[in-house]
């Protein structure tokens, strides 16, 4: 997929839900975030301050000084600030509390990142593929599946279409979790160092 080979992508029945609560707190505008795992426990909590960038005049987010786990927070910060660039009206004049909830174990690798990006893109009314570029990267096939909510034939963000995958053997297809989930960004960087035959891709 990273070399635009024609690929079939199929969503799982599990997903990620996002609830947005708007708060009329204009004195200090805050965006608080809580990510909840399938077992009901929080696996990330953070706060961001929303303020106007004096150079661009746009809203911009920065870390609250008390926030922890900045690795995840940094990724969220990039995604949300990119969403503001794509839609300057996003996050205007209010504070927000966001909760996300996974239907699956994060170690399964079923798309906690891509479903997050799709949810934020729908909320901000922006292009999910553009948000993906500043966060996790990749081919974008999972973004297409997440935005459509169904099967897709995929080559690139500009070359994909919906598809109905309904073979007679569909009841014999199973998901087997090997407990070998890898870091997506590291896997992509490792793949890009390899030479791939154009004949195979085509």
Where are these regions (language model features)?
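Intrinsically disordered, low-complexity linker/loop segments enriched in Gly/Pro
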Residues: 94, 106-108
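DPxDG-like acidic metal-binding loop motif
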Residues: 108-129
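C-terminal nucleotide
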Residues: 2, 8-13, 17-94, 101, ...
């Amino acid at each position: 997929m990273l070399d635009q080979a024609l690929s079939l992508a199929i969503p799982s029945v599990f997903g990620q839900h996002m609830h947005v609560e708007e708060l009329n707190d204009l004195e200090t505008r805050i965006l608080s975030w809580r990510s909840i795992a399938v077992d009901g426990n929080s696996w990330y909590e953070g706060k961001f301050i929303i303020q106007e960038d004096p150079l661009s005049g746009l809203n911009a987010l920065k870390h609250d000084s008390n926030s922890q786990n900045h690795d995840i927070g940094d990724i969220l910060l990039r995604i949300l600030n990119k969403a503001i660039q794509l839609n300057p009206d996003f996050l205007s004049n209010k504070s927000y509390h966001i909760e996300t909830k996974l239907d699956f174990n994060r170690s399964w690798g079923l798309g906690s990142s891509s479903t997050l990006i799709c949810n934020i893109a729908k909320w901000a009314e922006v292009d999910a593929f553009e948000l993906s570029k500043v966060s996790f990267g990749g081919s974008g096939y999972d973004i297409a599946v997440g935005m459509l909510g169904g099967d897709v034939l995929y080559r690139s963000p500009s070359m994909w279409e919906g598809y109905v995958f309904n073979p007679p053997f569909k009841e014999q297809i199973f998901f087997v979790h090997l407990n070998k989930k890898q870091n997506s960004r590291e896997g992509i960087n490792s793949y890009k160092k390899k030479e791939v035959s154009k004949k195979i891709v085509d």
